[in-house]
Amino acid sequence: MNIDDVLWKEAGCSTELDYIEQTSWLLFLKYLDDLEAEKVMEAELAGKSYERIIAKEYQWDQWAVPKNAQGEFDHNNALTGDDLIDFVNDKLFRYLRGLKDRATGPDTLEYKISEIFGEIKNKFSSGYSLRDALEHIDSLSFGLQEEKHE
């Protein structure tokens, strides 16, 4: 099964445009998290610190696919069903839309993220379908150069 199969079963997604929009915001958040993790690692290696753009509770590995101590998906702490939909609609999107309030200007990444998520609506109505999509997206890694073009 792939993401298109998940979206095809989702009542809120009825057109290819819906598929693209929903896949895009998920891919973007996963890519951003991988990019931020890479920047944290680079800063640590240089003896510096790096402050992530996204607050901890809204980072991919906290809400989308929490991991246990072994780095495996933590089913016990993962949101699903209505809890996942409520988090995305009521907390995550609200947080992302509000990033421009702390942005220093319109050319910052915070401002741009805020503007993008101001236009996007989560069309997943089933938290179970969203959970499946998140797990598919999480299997992608944007850290390696050759994987960026898959």
Set out the residue ranges of the language-model regions.
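Non-catalytic, mostly N-terminal accessory regions of nucleic-acid modification and defense proteins
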Residues: 1-150
